[in-house]
């Protein structure tokens, strides 16, 4: 009978140790996050203060450590030749990295550049690809731009119901009154059959954005 409490105490000790290790790990992760945030803010402050060379150096350092916000900012500086010599190749490299790492602003900008052929050959199919990727990642702007592509049938087969649905989702995600007004005006032009299909499409995309 005396062995049970002893056994319990021995098994509790490593549990406490693991909990302490977990606390230490979480503290370290949080500390690194705070440092990364403060470093990024220093880079932004340098940029907004006109010290572009310093901002470029800070963004580059952060980008090399995987900060997606810095990757996007660095790409813009390369593309525009701010704080460094213009290098379109490096600009694209870092913008694609930022997009691949989940930066929705980079995704939307890539879509826009493909849509209008800025610094590259115009490709509306690629524009749809990046707008959709941004929309699926929760971007209201990405959803809006994707809606327009479906409505106009650019880079994708024209689909009024799907275009309307993505416009509604854009309005819901971003609280965008323009998107809401455009969705309502667009729906009013549709036949009753397409209006019903559009309403159903909204529900389907809300349940499964990949639908």
Regions from the language model: what does each represent?
Residues 45-46, 62, 73-80, 109-116, ...:
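Hydrophobic face of amphipathic alpha-helices that form TPR/SEL1-like repeat modules
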Residues 50-51, 64-67, 80-82, 87, ...:
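Short helix-capping/linker turns of helical repeat alpha-solenoids
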Residues 177-211:
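Terminal, low-structured helical/coil segments at or just beyond the last alpha-helical repeat
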Residues 25-33:
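Sec-dependent N-terminal signal peptides
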